[in-house]
């Protein structure tokens, strides 16, 4: 909720997740350079837990959701904030090329003790900006699978990001600058 409030939006306890797509060209490796958007100086980071769907599925109840998740990885939901806020949906501001680094590895579901109790930390140039735990997610991974699979078929390889803790740059106008080093770590994942 902290991140949503930092965007200047009033929220109560959300009843359904806010969902948006990212273009496939936003995906890149964890050590690839994040391209400067050139049309904005409001480039922001969002350290997030991501998970990968392992089985084609539809209408998956929460209790069975863990059975369709192949594994988990670290991700950065890079956002161009002014473009994100121009329209009601976030897709355009979150889909610039290279704005979804993830990896470097996928840790299979059976190797994770509890995906909803992992420490997550984001550092920019060595300064800790986000420090939280996935137990603070508004919607957990299994709720997201249930919600999304109610609307459409999930395919093997689909990458789903779970949301970010407080501490994003927009909260205090501390945006990324060219050459900044962003490091995101999640316990049990790297």
Task: Give each language-model segment a name.
Residues 125, 162-163, 187:
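Generic beta-strand/beta-sheet core signal
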Residues 140-176:
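A conserved acidic, glycine/proline-rich C-terminal tail/linker
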Residues 51, 157, 186:
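Conserved S/T- and glycine-rich ATP-binding loop of Class I adenylate-forming
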Residues 101, 166-190:
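Charged, cofactor-coupling segments
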Residues 1-128, 132, 181:
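Active-site microenvironments in enzyme catalytic cores
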């Amino acid at each position: 909720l902290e991140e949503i409030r930092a965007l200047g939006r009033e929220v109560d306890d959300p009843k359904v997740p806010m969902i948006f797509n990212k273009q496939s060209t936003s995906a890149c490796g964890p050590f690839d350079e994040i391209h400067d958007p050139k049309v904005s100086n409001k480039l922001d980071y969002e350290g997030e837990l991501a998970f990968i769907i392992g089985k084609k599925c539809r209408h998956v109840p929460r209790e069975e959701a863990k059975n369709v998740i192949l594994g988990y990885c670290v991700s950065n939901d890079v956002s161009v904030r002014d473009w994100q806020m121009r329209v009601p949906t976030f897709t355009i501001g979150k889909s610039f090329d290279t704005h979804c680094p993830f990896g470097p590895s996928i840790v299979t579901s059976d190797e994770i003790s509890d995906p909803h109790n992992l420490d997550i930390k984001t550092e920019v140039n060595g300064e800790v900006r986000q420090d939280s735990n996935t137990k603070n997610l508004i919607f957990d991974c299994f709720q997201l699978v249930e919600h999304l699979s109610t609307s459409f078929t999930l395919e093997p390889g689909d990458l789903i990001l779970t949301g970010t803790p407080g501490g994003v740059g927009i909260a205090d106008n501390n945006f990324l600058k060219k050459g900044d080093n962003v490091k995101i770590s999640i316990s049990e994942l790297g």
